[in-house]
């Protein structure tokens, strides 16, 4: 039998230790036995949102800025393939044209910042001359509502809009992104900066830059020589807002040089059959970033002026004047060292003027507009090749009116 002889001070220490040891057990027991609430009763909760009303004659799909940024390094046609009813026609490794329900080229209309894009869209190897990274929203519109943009919108339209200028934002804001692709060892960068001149009045501006550089692409087993590309883009916008008026002006430049695979230039049908039988090019050279003959070179300039006026009683007015210049040059391998002379050299100038009025009242919305389009196409002389597209001047004028009713 174990006997302990402790004085009163020692007994006090033992009792204190037992008390400290038992307190967590009691607390734990209290926590486990404490009732828990699986649900919380609230009073009335109202969740409200606004439904985007769309005409029964309009079928649209939108691509936001996040999706556009994530598609950096891809073509516009490749980006639009994610929209229902759309595909693309791809020529080579870079050129891609959007297709809406089997229609492409002049059967669909591309609208850039409020103006239709005028370029050489008749060829299957002519991609749209736009920098998709400069837009914050791309919308594909199909249906009867596309008719107001003209007869070229039979298949549908692709609306490309930048974000509004930051009139009410103070300080300098911007964003930058970069890419690198292993195929072709491509690298590129894109970004913009924007701000407002509060000290000078309600002015705002934005500058966007984009560049991309790539070398020869490759398949799983061999290189595709002379398939490099260069692209440099710039856009600048300036705006002023006061009361009911808003004025905006801007300029954009799109420059691109694309190499065409040398083995794709066939001299006759027998060479084509021989390449198909081999299943690969005959000659190979090491990887290079140099772009040699044959190649395509495109420069596209856009300058615009916009004026907006808002009035509560008479409605909203919008005027836009846009000038575009598209220069396309295509060089092939020619005999007698004449490769520097282009086989195709086209210069397309266009001037668009549009005036639109719209007003909403109760469940109705009225809209009317007029547009004047002047286009002039010129071929460079001395190429030694009969032009595919003749010289021409076109003047087109159109009017339209819309009346819509929206139910609750």
Language-model regions: role of each:
Residues 86:
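Hydrophobic acceptor-binding patch used for acceptor engagement in glycosyltransferases
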Residues 83:
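Acidic-histidine catalytic/liganding microenvironments
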Residues 34-36:
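Short linear regulatory motifs and low-complexity interaction segments
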Residues 1-32, 42:
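Bacterial Sec-dependent N-terminal signal peptides
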Residues 80:
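Active-site-adjacent helical/loop segments in soluble small-molecule enzymes
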Residues 38-41, 46-71, 89-92, 97-98, ...:
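Outer-membrane beta-barrel proteins, especially TonB-dependent receptors
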